[in-house]
Amino acid sequence: MNESSIDGRLPALPARHRMIWRWHFYAGLFCIPFIIWLSVTGAIYLFKPQFEAWQDHAYEHLPMTGAAAAPSQQVAAALAAAPGTRLNAYQIPRTPDSAAQIIVGQGESVYRAYVNPQSLEVLQVINDDHRPMQVVHDLHGRFLIGDPGSILTELAASWGIVMIVSGLYLWWPRDVRGLGGVLYPRLSRRGRPFWRDLHGVVGFWVSAFALFLIVSGLPWTHFWGSNFRALRQIGQAEAVKQDWATGRSAEMAERMAMNRPADVGDEHSQHRHGMTMAAPSDAGVVDTAALDRIVATLAPMSLAQPVKVYPPSQKSAQWYAWSLPPDRTQRVKLTFDAATGAVRTRQEFSDKRLIDRIVGVGVSAHEGQLFGWFNQMLGLLTTAGLIALSLSGFMAWFKRRPQGLLGAPPVLLGRGVPAALWGPALLLGLLLPMLGLSMIAVLIVERLLLRRIPGVRDFLGLQPA
């Protein structure tokens, strides 16, 4: 790739190539730890359905000697085991001898109670945030630090796009003498040439899948996702509803809304209409008799599991049920008349807006759930490829780094950013605001600070060649 910083050939490289290589180097330097982290946690999360089926196996095939109690009674048992909580959702037992999973909450906390549907024995109550796959989910997208972690993930993902696109440019064969080192690594090579071959070849094969994973994950991030939602809201009379939360704060706000009854906390709207209404003392109590009617309506529908029934809250003023299989394209949402249990509305995946369908398909594929085990294997190979890409890039750098220096491609004397790079840089900066802001910050810090400190300037390769 003509990239040695010590063999005297660098001055012959075009300014554009030098600049792209430099940005590729720094993008990789920043991204490698995050790529390895996201790849490992993402690979684990691919197998969430299988893991949680194993995790819950103790609550399957329960000994049953008679008919199950009413769902309302099961909910009452769960609430008694978790005092002070409110019903968030009732998950219909997967089989007649499976435990009912009842989700209850208080404030920002959510708990899952496993209840024997016949004896009403509460088998276990666990904080949902402590379930292993929820921990992996939070490690993957937020580093367990909430919105700051989501922003950091988005920043790494944005620079990951720079790394991949610039890497493809550097990989592009300009003097083809065979496919070795282009489409497959030359295994007979040793040392740095071998690692460079491996880095370029793996990068080529994994690039399209890696770009897909990055782009499909952006709607879930705090900064990009929130702005994406704001753009969708333009020109819409009603608030845009999404099936996903953009960051930890949005998720916590949603939990708080679910833990507040629908008819409490709106005093201002009552005063605006000239009414003074005292909230009933039992306003926070859910009419669980409606749950019994709704579950009876759902019984013959054979919706894809799991199926959860949600009571009215400040999130939604009506009872609704949601079929939530891992493949989002198979999900169904229904609303109900609480008095009769009759279905009011039914929304299939095909009924959603186009952008919601695109995001839904993308996330299902991202999580390895769109087309079965092959999707999981493809995701696993992609994450393994990204780890190999990161390690081979590190080794290629480690083998060539000059003693006492970082080994970054030095800048060219009197040469700024080539004109051909301004367009792509501006486009990426607009589409990925965190990338644009960080690029500006890097350029300012480099030019105004780092180049003025001799030791730092030499170490980073900022001394013009």
Task: Describe the predicted segments one by one.
Residues 1-465:
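Conserved histidines in hydrophobic membrane contexts and catalytic metal-binding motifs
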